[in-house]
């Protein structure tokens, strides 16, 4: 039961009839037996307008009679320093020590011999 002072606020639905798309489940051939498996293809400029630009990671939730696609937010850009540290991790132990010594000299913690 509603309160006597409550007023229903009209709202506009996020999904309007203009945003609806009609698709048909097609099929794709599966190698090596070439059996037909269900396939859904989505393409069009409307995908980018909806937040699904090329390269966007997508979370897929599957329920009976319903598939929900959600665009994942882009990962934060890694700083140039962190990218450099990742490169240093790939170096030999000797070169890693040299980088550590260089950082110590730059930071003023060590004296140059």
UniProtKB/Swiss-Prot annotation:
Give start and end of each SpoVT-AbrB domain: 29-74
The main location is cytoplasm
Please verify whether the record's keywords include Chloroplast: no
Gene Ontology CC terms, in alphabetical order: cytoplasm
First-level EC class: hydrolase
Q: Which GO terms describe its molecular function?
A: DNA binding; RNA binding; RNA endonuclease activity
The record's subcellular locations are:
Cytoplasm
Cross-referenced PROSITE patterns, in alphabetical order? Answer: SPOVT_ABRB (PS51740)
Xref: Pfam families: SymE_toxin (PF08845)
Q: Which GO terms describe its biological process?
A: RNA metabolic process
Which UniProt keyword terms apply here?
Answer: Cytoplasm, DNA-binding, Endonuclease, Hydrolase, Nuclease, RNA-binding
InterPro entries found in the cross-reference section:
SpoVT-AbrB_dom (IPR007159), Toxin_SymE-like (IPR014944), TypeI_TA_SymE (IPR020883)
Which HAMAP family does the annotation name?
Endoribonucl_SymE
Q: What does this protein do?
A: Involved in the degradation and recycling of damaged RNA. It is itself a target for degradation by the ATP-dependent protease Lon.
To which protein family does this belong? Belongs to the SymE family.
> What is this protein called in UniProt?
Endoribonuclease SymE
Question: What is the native source organism of this protein?
Answer: Escherichia coli O1:K1 / APEC
Gene name of the record = symE
């Amino acid at each position: 039961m509603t309160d006597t002072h409550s007023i229903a606020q009209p709202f506009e639905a996020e999904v309007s009839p203009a945003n609806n798309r009609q698709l048909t489940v097609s099929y794709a051939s599966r190698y090596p037996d070439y059996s037909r498996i269900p396939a859904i293809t989505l393409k069009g400029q409307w995908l980018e307008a909806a937040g699904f630009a090329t390269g966007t990671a997508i979370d897929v939730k599957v329920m009976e009679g319903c598939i929900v696609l959600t665009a994942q937010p882009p990962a934060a850009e890694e700083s140039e320093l962190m990218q450099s540290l990742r490169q240093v991790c790939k170096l030999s132990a000797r070169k890693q020590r040299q980088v550590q010594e260089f950082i110590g000299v730059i930071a003023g913690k060590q004296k140059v011999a």
